[in-house]
Amino acid sequence: MIKIESRVLGPVGTNCYLIINKENNESIIIDPADSPESIYDMVVRSGSKPQAILLTHGHFDHIGAANEVREHYGIKIYASCD
């Protein structure tokens, strides 16, 4: 079963998602826009273990906290080459 959590982050209200596999509690963070602390809170509340960050595209409002979140969890970032 998959669960989806979301937060609206940053100056332009970008949607950041946490996709959680409830069978193993692993998750993927999508578009960590801003406010790493808010992302960490969302992860803690879900009880999940992030496995990766997925960027839908490279605009500033979708990647603002990507490196900090990557370093915090020791996970990789995946993005399209476009």
Q: What is each PLM-predicted segment?
A:
Residues 35-82:
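Active-site HxH/HxHxD metal-binding segment of metal-dependent hydrolases
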Residues 1-46:
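Conserved beta-strand hairpin/beta-sheet module of binuclear metal-dependent hydrolase folds
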